[in-house]
């Protein structure tokens, strides 16, 4: 009898330890078929995914740190732009580790204390987060909402990121977006089809005044092409 009780107690303890050790699912399936990562205390966490069009593939290495800030590194692959020696794996490649929202200022200040709310994926990636800024010597939390939408072009050698900033504060704000353009050129002798050009830039720059509830949208575009 004592042996039976001991075995029964052990089985309960063993089953309980398995339940505790088993990690919770980070992603949940939505009604529309998308998967959603609702950011909670299960951070920091890093992950990656690959998306492709006809002329470009992109690997996104992304994550949310312990302070709920989003980070992103992009690896672009251009399969139609071949490099010497002419083998399958020798395509034009380039990484970009730039933080686009960090280029934008609100009332001449850096956006503060990003908090990612959720990440969704249904063929394209969507990231929802919020920032604060200093107003009259105090931080206004959740004052600027940001939506990132990340995807490759289906038929061009181009990868796009949409950025939509919304003024969620009770005050008028001024956003400044810089002119940002980057160009890389490969040596002519390195490419099967000669020299190649990789370009990245913002679709919009300038000073933008947003009243409460108003939005500003612009794109970051990364592309590759032959120079000839």
Predicted regions and their residues:
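Bacterial Sec-dependent N-terminal signal peptides
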Residues: 1-23
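Terminal accessory carbohydrate-recognition/targeting modules of carbohydrate-active enzymes
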Residues: 21-228
């Amino acid at each position: 009898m004592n042996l039976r009780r001991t075995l029964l107690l052990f089985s309960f303890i063993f089953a309980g330890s398995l339940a505790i050790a088993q990690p919770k699912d980070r992603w949940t399936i939505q009604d529309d078929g998308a998967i959603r990562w609702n950011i909670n205390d299960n951070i920091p966490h890093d992950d990656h995914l690959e998306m492709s069009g006809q002329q470009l593939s992109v690997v996104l290495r992304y994550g949310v740190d312990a302070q709920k800030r989003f980070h992103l590194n992009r690896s672009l692959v251009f399969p139609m732009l071949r490099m010497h020696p002419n083998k399958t794996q020798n395509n034009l490649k380039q990484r970009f580790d730039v933080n686009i929202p960090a280029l934008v200022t609100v009332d001449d200040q850096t956006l503060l204390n990003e908090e990612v709310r959720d990440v969704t994926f249904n063929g394209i990636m969507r990231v929802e987060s919020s920032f604060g800024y200093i107003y009259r010597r105090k931080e206004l939390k959740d004052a600027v909402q940001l939506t990132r939408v990340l995807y490759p072009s289906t038929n061009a050698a181009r990868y796009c990121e949409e950025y939509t900033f919304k003024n969620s504060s009770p005050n008028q704000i001024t956003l400044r977006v810089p002119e940002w353009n980057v160009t890389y050129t490969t040596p002519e002798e390195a490419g099967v089809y000669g020299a190649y050009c990789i370009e990245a830039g913002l679709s919009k720059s300038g000073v933008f005044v947003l009243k409460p509830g108003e939005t500003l949208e612009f794109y970051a575009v990364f592309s590759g092409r032959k120079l000839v």
